[in-house]
Regions:
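Histidine-/acidic-rich catalytic cores in large beta-rich domains
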Residues: 4-14, 18-56, 60, 78-80, ...
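Short beta-strand segments within Ig-like beta-sandwich modules, predominantly Fibronectin type-III
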Residues: 70-76
């Protein structure tokens, strides 16, 4: 059958939740559902009832105190205990404890899990000073292919999603995660929007955007979402130069920031600049105190800050070479020793002290081709800048990575996180080598025998207290606790926003002749039709620039 229909998220989740019953189950005979939403294999749901209201405490036993998790559940007679952080391919030990009628009740439960997928990557190196670490996990998202995975301080996998979830993976104020959908809207990597999920992988909301989602988002103080998006129908044919504010409750776009109205598209040209991807925004950060938005333009080697209310440009961090005269006043003048500009940066953020924290990928280290530094002599850094907007000066106050030379060099992606004063994560997520030599390009563009790596370092008071090396590229990493105060809700899934409408050519085509070789054509071009809840997806393999017409009848179902 050419046409396949995809089951809706609501239908699938409602079907699974029919099994979530507590009636007839007690602490001595609880119901245990492994991976209840078929999306997060290292989780389980334990269900039972008690005669009186009790507050169960659950302990998932680890190898040591840094890998053992405890969570207290709310007072109730009906119990839906979320079990997270199970080890793969192991009989896990879980202890449930509560007090009822002045009696302490304890119950030990064992849950056996399956093996990890063969293509899920395990660490090749782990260093952990456990005296300075908690039991929080390190949540990684894939560069392109792969899994969203959380590792503990021993490097063991304690959580992962089977559904593809790309780009950022940050916890919202309500305790849920916000991840990119698996649904492609436009090549090469733009997806339809965002899913709000819990640790089971249950989807509570889907936010769809006409311009899709890429790279980053930010949860504003009022709960709305600032999302890196596109306008696929703009007259300039550009991408990655739009940021939208999405109403959290309705999914409607209530404000649009178009960077074509802020910057000159021909300024600040770097090696990676193209006419359509001139800015390449890869991070979004909102600062309440200044009511401003900080964005990272990789292809301009520039971090910019704009006014939220007016969209006017406030300042630019970066080398001002190749920028027109009218923009020079927005650049900072460097002061102090050992200062270096950032190049092809990612993950720009504003710290509580109003410093600017950036992952400096370090590509070329110049805008002038004759001065380009080759990959084998390049290095990437997490760098902290202190800016003075009164006299427009900038000082480099901290960095990590230069001392690691090209072994820590990521030509693309990567991340930094501010955890607390003098406490940071620097994630070099795009280390690529071709024939053992550092590459300036992602894996698909690197020649020779390609090897991939990500190297993530946690630093406290200038001392490395944790490091994890993985044999793959990872987009970002977030250090987060396994549990929050948010418990499972059986509320229905909400679909918010819109993908817009596809332009239709109303030209009359005429009579369509049946083709006896239709099956061969479908096979030759790998043609597929997928009927989703909000769109019909046509896919196939054709020669570049070939025109393909998709003709639908009015009575098509």
């Amino acid at each position: 059958v050419l046409l396949n229909k995809k089951e809706s998220i609501m239908t699938l989740q409602k079907s699974l939740e029919k099994e979530f019953v507590t009636k007839g189950y007690t602490i001595d005979n609880p119901k245990i559902i492994k991976d209840p939403y078929k999306a997060s294999p290292l989780t389980a749901l334990i269900l039972f009832k008690t005669k009186t209201k009790v507050s169960p405490k659950v302990t998932i036993k680890g190898k040591d105190i840094n890998t053992t998790f405890t969570h207290n559940f709310k007072n109730s007679k009906e119990h839906y205990l979320e079990i997270y952080g199970l080890y793969p391919d192991k009989e896990n030990e879980i202890e449930i404890e509560y007090k009822e009628n002045d009696q302490v009740v304890k119950k030990a439960i064992k849950i056996k899990t399956d093996k990890l997928p063969s293509d899920l990557h395990l660490p090749t190196k782990i260093f952990a000073d456990k005296t300075k670490l908690s039991n929080e996990l390190y949540f990684f998202t894939p560069a392109v292919k792969g899994y969203s995975v959380a590792y503990d301080v021993n490097g063991d996998v304690r959580w992962y999603l089977t559904n593809k979830a790309v780009w950022d993976n940050t916890r919202l104020k309500n305790g849920h995660l916000l991840v990119g959908t698996e649904r492609l809207i436009y090549k090469p990597y733009y997806v339809t929007g965002l899913y709000e999920i819990d640790m089971f992988g249950k989807v509570y909301k889907e936010y769809s955007l006409p311009g899709g989602y890429h790279h980053d988002y930010f949860e504003m103080p009022n709960g709305n979402l600032l999302v890196a998006s596109n306008d696929f129908h703009n007259s300039s044919g550009t991408v990655e130069d739009i940021v939208v504010e999405v109403d959290r409750n309705t999914g409607k776009i209530i404000k649009t920031f178009d960077l074509k109205n802020v910057l000159n598209m021909k300024d600040g040209v770097s090696e990676n600049s193209t006419s359509y991807d001139w800015f390449h925004n890869n991070s979004v950060w909102y600062d309440r105190d200044t009511n401003s938005i900080t964005l990272s333009g990789r292809h301009m080697d520039a971090v910019i800050n704009i006014d939220y209310k007016t969209s006017k440009l406030n300042w630019i961090i970066g080398d001002s070479t190749n920028w027109s005269k009218e923009y020079q006043k927005y650049f900072f003048k460097s002061i102090g020793e050992n200062f270096e500009w950032q190049w092809r940066q990612h993950a720009a953020m504003i710290t509580p002290k109003k410093d600017v924290f950036i992952f400096d990928n370090g590509n070329n280290k110049s805008k002038i081709k004759e001065k380009y530094v080759p990959a084998e002599k390049s290095y990437s850094r997490g760098v902290l800048y202190k800016i003075n907007k009164e006299d427009m000066t900038i000082r480099q106050v901290w960095q990590y990575g230069k001392e690691r030379s090209s072994s820590f060099y990521s030509s693309y992606i990567s991340d930094v996180d501010y955890l607390d004063k003098n406490h940071y994560i620097v994630h070099s997520g795009g280390i690529v080598k071709g024939d053992l030599k550092s590459s300036n390009y992602p894996a698909g563009l690197t020649k020779g025998k390609v090897s991939l790596m990500s190297d993530t370092v946690e630093i406290l008071n200038n001392e490395v207290i944790f490091e994890i090396v993985l044999p793959t590229n990872n987009y970002r990493v977030e250090k987060m606790p396994l549990y929050t105060d948010t418990n499972l809700s059986l509320n229905n899934f909400k679909k918010l926003g819109t993908l817009g409408k596809t332009k239709v050519n109303k030209e009359k085509i005429g009579i369509l002749n049946s083709n006896k070789n239709l099956d061969n054509i479908i096979k030759k071009y790998d043609i597929k039709l997928l009927n989703e809840e909000d769109r019909l997806v046509f896919s196939g393999r054709f020669k570049k620039n070939n025109k393909v017409n998709v003709i639908l009848y009015k009575n098509f179902v």
